[in-house]
Structures are given as structure tokens and as C-alpha cells.
């Protein structure tokens, strides 16, 4: 066989393999390896892969395998838009998992609307970010909606909430929104007198001055608007200075390892969550598999977070939408199939997710149960449960 013929046959074989590859159903993914919420993002991809493996193990979608293509945003909004465009235009993804933060969603959702591709966040919770867009969805609940349940639970438990103060980071969108809008508004609605607030930067290591100011205010509760890392440092400094006020927060601090890492300094802290593994056998099975894979990857996790569960569910939502819309992955039908995924998700009712039955509201946010958790000695205890939409 001459070299030209051999080359022709190799090229022909490569081309023959292309259609099968092209029929893989591609999901884009926008993880954040840096930024104020990097610890929350670190294990989300493992959760997504569990869902992919489960779907593919039973034949995929009409015989077509699902797979994930990732682009790391490093927590930067401009890179999130670059990533979305690459995944949509170069990689021909049918839909996108993420981004994680509200700052990223602010720019990704309008970009996704222009392109015509669904992007679904597993963690963004700043109020009304998805509402103006048809392709922007969030498998999260509004922080105001969740924090109302925290305050209601505190009232029902008769925990002291007569006076409150607030500590929040000013250098990321959701922390600032929590500190300036969500926490003070809902605390006041609940009859709590807000006596003052302090601010800090996410990367600030020394929070002694802020803790001293909070000590002087001497309030029953201290609302925290930040990611997990500064919340840990603040709790430790408050207890070092002898401040006994109960810490309360939204889901922005909801790292599954938070209780273990803070230890006794966090005793009494109350936050909302949308995932509690004790809610079902399905949720427990997911967490067991998740912990096994996390350990195999050399990461330190003793439990799955609500953002891990939300990421798993996003993949399952997309699989459901692809089945219902009879998606093929055909490049010639890409725009129509992306829109069909959007329309199916928006019409979805009470999908049996890990977190409970989930639908999407008109504002693009998931309607899901809220679990109110209290920290004690390195563990989370369930103290309140609110069904979806209650």
C-alpha cells in the first residue's frame, strides 16, 4: 500500500468517527477555582460527574452519552463571559452548568440570552438576577426568601432576637447585598432592632477591630454577609473577644465543612440550606458516593453541600429536558434544541430532585424546600423545615 493511499484511509477513518462523537450531548460547565466562593465550587464538578455517570449507565439520552466540557472562570465575571462564549460557540454545548456567583451571573445571563443558551447557577442568590432573562435560571432560592425562614424559626424556638448587628464583606456582589439589603430588612421585619453594622474585605485576615465594634453593640444576634472563609475568621475572633451573640446568615456561608472547621466557636450559628441528606434515601446514597469520590480525588470533605446537590440536580434537570424535547445533538438543530431545553425546564413541575420536589418560578429561580440548620460542636442539626413555596 502506498503512502498516499494509507493517508487517505486514515483520514477517512477519522472522518467516519466524527458523527458518533458529534452526537455526544455536551454540557458546558463554568467552575470557579478562585474568588470568595472557591471553596464552595471545588467539589461541584464531582457532583456533576456523578449525575453524568448515572445517566450514561442507563443508556444516556436515547442512546447518546452526555459529557461535560469545562472552562474555569477563576471567579472573574469577565472570564465567565469568555467561557460561556467558548462553550456555546466553539464547543457547541447544549446548555451550561453555572456560573456559581451572583457577580458572574450578572454578566453571563445577558450574554446567554443573546446567544440563546441556558445557563443555570447552583449558588447565585442575589435577589432577582435571573428575572429579566428567559435563558437564565438558578437552581437556588432567593436569599431573602431563605433568610425569612431563619428568622421565623428563631421566633418559633423563642431564641433571643430583640437586638441585632451586621458584619459583611463589601467586595463581592452577594455579600454586599446581604449586608446592606437582605439582612437588615428581614431582621427589622421580624421585630429585631438593628443597632449597627461593620464591614470588611473578603481577604482580610485581621478582624479584631470589627469584632471589637460588634462587642460594643452587644446584640442578641449578629447577621453575617460573606463567604465561608471570612465567616470562620470572624467567628473565631468574636469568641476570642468574648462576644456571645448568635451568628445568623444566609446560604452564602453554606460550606458543608463550615461546622467542622469553626468547631465550638460556631455553636449556635443558624443558617438556611436547601439540602439535608437525611431527607431521603436518594439523598443519602448521593452523599455516600460523593464522599467516596471526593476522598479518591484527595480532597477533604465529610459531607456534600447544598451547592454540590444543586449541581447534581442541574445535570438531572438537563437530562430530563433533553429526553422530553427529544434532543439529538445535531449541529443543524442546535439553536432549536437549546430553546427546547429552556422551554421544557420552565414548564417542569415538581421534579423529584435530591433536595426535594423542584419547579421553576416565573423569575427563573427554583422553588425548593428550605432547611434551617443550627451548628453545635462541629455538626449541623435540623431545627426547621419549610416545603417548597411555603
Language-model features: locations:
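N-terminal secretory signal peptides that target proteins for export/translocation
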Residues: 1-2
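Extracytosolic ligand-binding ectodomains
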Residues: 5-12, 22-390
